[in-house]
Regions:
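Conserved alpha/beta-hydrolase "acid-adjacent" motif
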Residues: 275-283
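A catalytic-pocket lid/entrance helix-loop region that shapes and gates access to the active site
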Residues: 128, 153-222, 290-340
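Accessory cap/linker subdomain of secreted extracellular hydrolases
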Residues: 85-86, 90-96, 102, 164-261, ...
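N-terminal cap/lid segment of alpha/beta-hydrolase-fold proteins
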Residues: 12-61
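Cap/lid segment of the alpha/beta-hydrolase catalytic domain
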Residues: 61-141, 312-322
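Alpha/beta-hydrolase fold nucleophile elbow
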Residues: 144-156
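C-terminal, loop-rich substrate-recognition/catalytic regions characterized by aromatic stacking residues
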Residues: 29, 315-429
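Short beta-strand/loop motif that positions the catalytic acidic residue
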Residues: 262, 268-270, 274
Length: 430
């Protein structure tokens, strides 16, 4: 049997359109007690969100909510800002609006503290931000039109906010779908013995794009912002000697806390060629969540920092960096696949989805594994003295680019008589 997918848009669709329509957008602002999260910040702050209900709520039906929680509403410099929460977000917002509202889901867009019309400190990935996110999930799950189930969706920072929500373990948070979502700030920016150059300016870049450069900005400034401006450059320069590792970054590590506190399911989506939020943000946590009893499913493609169905971005990768997989990369079944996931975990409808990892090989072929990396793997070691090295390494380049490496190490085949499938990240011991 051949399924006919809708290929006419920039994102995928469900197989059958739903019977309902979206009602007019509604907005809500509610106050949150923040006296316990910011030592010198405001004692209260407001969360602002917008939401669209399906037309079946007019008949008294209660529906689940799919939400995107983000700093990116009204994001950017004054005069060049992105859309507010009351405008359906391009890409990920339109995908949810067009696919799932007609099937009886509410859709919400939430701005984190210190962004758009949400007040308080812009606490970049910090405790205050997570507290506001948790309160938004609680609010969505407690409305009289809600069935009490909330699912979160989004990529990158909008994937990180899902883990921030999971830390608090709301009874309303039934599932998360982090797409290349950051699980911890320190391992994002500092790994394998070195720091990324962007670590110096990440906090300032976000803060500079969320303020309006007027008197209202004073409400967005807290000690953690000042600390963040120092934490990045200090980490970049001092590495393991960085005194901020034990406090600033610990507060911004979410996944180990979610492992303890969260009670929902996880649909993990990750680009295996994503060098913005690279796969170590997911692995080995993927198996750890399975071991802890979570329902976990994965879609792991050779795309970069993109959605599974974002075909407009699945076209410019170089050989060895996903280029060989482009011809079979885009998942036009993503809308339907996710619909079945939401139906089960947010409505209790249909069969339980298979809990496996769909992993795309370098050559583009997709395979099914129980987990990733597979448990039945063997480790292979290659002594470097059997390899050849050419090139030079140049140190002392400006902080904007770090050192420049031109070293090439060539080693023999892992096996001379059989094909080898490599999974995971190779480790170099010097």
């Amino acid at each position: 049997h051949t399924l006919e997918w809708n290929w006419t848009d920039s994102y995928s669709y469900v197989l059958q359109p739903g019977p309902y329509t979206a009602l007019e957008v509604q907005e809500a602002t509610f106050e949150v007690d923040t006296s316990g999260v910011w030592e010198t910040g405001p004692a209260t702050a407001n969360v602002h969100l917008s939401y669209w209900l399906p037309s079946n709520t007019e008949m008294g039906e209660q529906v689940p909510v799919i939400a995107v929680i983000s700093p990116y509403f009204s994001y950017g410099q004054p005069g060049d800002e992105s859309g507010a929460t009351n405008v359906v977000g391009a890409g990920r917002g339109e995908f949810i609006y067009d696919n799932y509202i007609p099937h009886g889901y509410a859709f919400a867009q939430v701005s984190v503290f210190g962004t758009e019309e949400s007040s308080g400190c812009f606490d970049y990935r910090g405790e205050g931000e997570g507290w506001g996110i948790h309160q938004a999930v609680e609010w969505l799950g407690q409305q009289n039109w809600s069935n009490g189930k909330v699912g979160l969706y989004g990529k990158s920072y909008e994937g990180a906010t899902q883990w921030e929500a999971a830390v608090h373990g709301s009874e309303h948070l039934a599932t998360i779908v982090p797409i290349s979502g950051t699980t911890g700030l320190h391992p994002l920016l500092y790994k394998n013995g070195s720091a990324e150059a962007r670590s110096q300016v990440m906090h300032m870049n976000y803060f500079g794009s969320t303020v309006d450069y007027n008197g209202d900005d004073l409400d967005n400034v807290c000690p953690d912002i000042i600390e963040g401006l120092f934490a990045g450059p200090v980490t970049y320069g001092m590495g393991e000697l960085d005194p901020y590792m034990a406090n600033y970054y610990e507060e911004r590590e979410h996944i180990s806390k979610a492992l303890t506190n969260y009670n929902g399911s996880v649909y993990w989506v990750q680009g295996m060629q994503d060098w913005n939020v690279d796969p170590h943000q997911v692995f080995p946590w993927y198996q750890m969540f399975i071991d802890a009893g979570f329902d976990v499913r994965g879609m792991l493609g050779q795309w970069e920092h993109n959605y599974p169905d974002q075909w407009t971005k699945h076209n410019a990768q170089e050989s060895g960096y996903g280029g060989e997989a482009i011809q079979n990369m885009t998942r036009w079944d993503w809308g339907q696949d996710l619909f079945e996931w939401f139906e089960y975990y947010l409505k209790g409808v249909g069969e339980k989805p298979e809990l496996h990892a769909q992993i795309q090989r370098n050559d583009g072929e997709w395979r099914i594994e129980d987990t990733w990396p597979p448990l039945d793997r063997d480790f292979a070691e290659i002594p470097l003295d059997t390899c050849t090295q050419t090139g030079t390494r140049v140190q002392g380049v400006s902080v904007s680019g770090g050192s420049v490496s031109g070293v090439v190490i060539e080693c023999g085949a892992l096996s001379g008589d059989s094909d080898i499938s490599i999974s995971g990240l190779a480790t170099l011991h010097l």
